[in-house]
Structures are given as structure tokens and as C-alpha cells.
Amino acid sequence: MRLRLLPKSTVRRLSFLLAATVAIAGLSACGSGGSSGSAGNATSGTINWWGWTPTDTATADNYIAAFNKQYPNIKVNYKLVNISDWVAALRPALASGQGPDVFDVQPGAYVTEFKSFAEDLTPMAEQALGSDWKSKVAPIGISGLTADGRLVAMSVGAVYAGMLWINEGTFQKYNLSPPTTLSEWEHVCQVLKQNNVGCFVQGAAQEGFDQDTLQSIANSVQPGLWTKASTGDAKWNDPGIVQTLAIWKQMFGDGIMQTGAVGYQQYPDANNDFLTGKYGMVMMGTWYTQYATNKAMTAALSAAGVSGAKPFPILPVAFPDVAGKGNTSEMYGDSDFGLAVATKSKNRAAAETFVKWVTTTTAGQQVIADQLDDLPALKSVEPNLNVIQLVNPSSQTKPVQDLVTSVGTVTEPRESLLSADVQTAILAAATSVATGKATPQQAADTLQQAAEAAGETFK
């Protein structure tokens, strides 16, 4: 799952505090992004990889072990850096030339922050995949990791949102079908509540997940409107955004949202309530696909405090047409993270070999795909569902396969276009409408004012 990094304002403060260190280390020498290290050997050597993800070092070790089957003479050391320490640790290390050879990059502010320390990987992509390499990679993994015409990092995989996950057993028990409209959604909730089962659970206290639901509602109202507001091509108080907030309010008033949703966190509250069977539906993205497997579902149930629970099948379903306009559910996403090669790396060739293997080879991308957390960057690679043990292959294989296939052409971003200030304003708008402290129009106007105050420009 994509982790949210520090807000841009925090990045700016840390950058200012580190300015003296950076200057002493010769930051200006690497400002152009040109190489100042040495190439070294492409098939041997030791490289250091720093990242905030994978958060489970065992997963990183699995990637490295698979890589070493083909390149046994390249030793890769993975260093997990806490997300809150990322900028403070990485920037001076890269500037001094004593930092990692390979480092994680997330779309958005961090591409801008670290682009001068990273090699342009366009030549590597062309060498690995051909001159038409862009046609072979999920587009969302290119746009978010490119700055000033340079490919700052190569996408490892992406996460997408815009759909729901349902408890298949609960829906079967009460003879229910996944809702396709707002009224059908309300009906499903009525039936489940009559049987003392929760319907839909949301951690409405967390901006990122409120944003997912709002973006999906907006796509039902007017496809692409949310992205246009994010880029300044539409305003946040556009009538379509006002209608989006009105439908959001209706979900609270008509009993789709659970009581107390505004005080809920998506993790751990909503996640645990869904996985323990208290609710039949939850708004999660493609990262939730991992829980379609026996292994991950069993581990998740244990983490949720359920002892000896039997894994149950979950299914991805389209977000309902809540606006009733006949618009199909649109997915949106970002590269979860990409791998960059440091300009000052003394083992640049070996570092590029590692990045190339992880991001552009079938073998490397298959390792990523089979984790069912990130979806691979290469369009030609999909999870091997014949090997992965799903909880109920007969019912889950096709929906999971369809989901994986459908996101390969997604171009609408999820979070990468939004500043921290706008994200904070989105949460304020969502909660003020949900609690009745503001009308949809008032909340939209306040959101627009906050975006303008944050320096966003609009046409």
C-alpha cells in the first residue's frame, strides 16, 4: 500500500535546515542531475538500497534473493528508513556521495525534491524495453515519476483505487448482489442491518480514504472532474464538486456510512471491522488484493485479534453509479514507488542492473506481481493466479484477474497532484459536510479558498 510521505511544508522546512550541510557537501555540483560517480561493473559489486518500503524487510530480501539467482555477484544491502526520517536521512547522504546507490522515490513532491540526485533512467528504459518502452509500462508509472523531461525513477508497481471490496459469504447468505446504484446500495444496507450485520465501513477520519470515496463519487457525477480540480482546470466549488459533497452527505443520512464514521480510522478500525466480518463492504484499493489469498487473509485475521478464524473470500466490485447518470466506475492510481539510481553512486552500473531487473524484466516484475500488494509496472506481467493460493479460486480468480487487467490503461492520478494543504482542506470539507457543520456549497467554497491560499492557480 502506498504510504503517505511528509507534507510539502515539512519537506521545505527540513530542506532549509539541511541547507548548510548540503552546501558543504557540494549540492550545487549535482544540481544538473549529471553523473558524478563512477560506472563500475554491471555484473558485480556491492550496492546499497535505501527505502521506506517494502516495510517488511523480508519482502525486500525476497526481491534480492530472486535477483541474485541471475546476478549472484551483485550484493544488495537493503536499509529500511523510517518514513518520518526519510528527507533528513536521505538528502545529506545523497549530497555527500556517501548515501545509497539506489533509493525509493514516490510521485509528487519527492520527485521534485530528489530529482537532482537521480540519474535520468530514460536511456535505461529504452535499452531494456525498446524505443516504444512507454507503450509497455502502465502510464501512471511514467507521468508521476517524470520531471523536467527526465525519468527520475522507474516504477516498481502501482496502487489503484475506485472500487469496493465485499465479503462474498455475507452477500450470499442474505441473497444480495453488489449494488450498482445509490438506491441499491441503500437496500443492501437495510437488509444487512435488519440481520444485525454492518453494511459499509469507512474510516472517515483519514483524508486519503475520504478522498478515494469522494473521487469515485465525482467520477459518477462527471468523469475526470476531480482530476481537473486537482490540476486547476476546474475549481473546487464547481457545481459537480458541490453535488459530490451532497451525495457524500446523503451516504451518511441514508445509513450507508456506519454510525461514528467521522471518528473512525481506516487503519486499523475499518480494516479490522471488515476482516472480522462485522461489515459486508469496505472502500479499499488494489493493495487489498493480497487479502484474497489464504496466507495474507490468515495473517490479517490474526493481526486483527481473531484466533483460529477461517479465511473468507473477498471480491472486488465496481463503485456504484451513485449520481445515477450512467457513468461507469473509473479507477485512479499512482505509482506506489519507483527506484532511482544516485548520480554519485560509485557502482552505478550494478545499481542500474538491479533497477532494470526489478522494473523491466518479466522475472523481476513477476516477483512484485505475486505479492498482490503493488500491481506490476509492466503491462505484460500479471499475478500468477495458478500458483497463488486464493481463499476460493472458483469465485475469486476471474474478478481478481479482471481487476488486474483493467488498471493497465489507467491515467487518472490518485494523490500525486494534491499538495498537503489541499489534502487537509479536503478532509475538512468532508467532515464538515458529514457532521452538518457546513452545507455542500459552503464546504466547496471553503475548499476552493484554501486551495487558492495554498498557492494553487486555476483557469
Language model features by range: what are they?
Residues 254-256, 299-373:
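Extracytoplasmic/periplasmic substrate-recognition and gating elements
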Residues 147-156, 186-237, 253:
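Extracytoplasmic/periplasmic solute-binding protein
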Residues 93, 101, 130-169, 326-332, ...:
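A structural signal for short loop-to-beta-strand junctions that line the ligand-binding cleft
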Residues 191-192, 231-262, 315, 319:
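Glycine-centered hinge/linker elements that transmit conformational signals in sensory
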Residues 136, 311-319, 369-421, 425:
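Long, aromatic- and glycine/proline-rich binding clefts that accommodate carbohydrate-like moieties
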Residues 146, 155, 229, 392-450:
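C-terminal capping/gating helix-and-loop segments adjacent to ligand/active sites or protein-protein/ligand interfaces
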Residues 66-136, 172-180, 280-281, 299-300, ...:
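Extracytoplasmic "Venus flytrap"/periplasmic binding protein-like
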Residues 108-161, 213, 309-317:
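Hinge/lid segment of periplasmic solute-binding proteins
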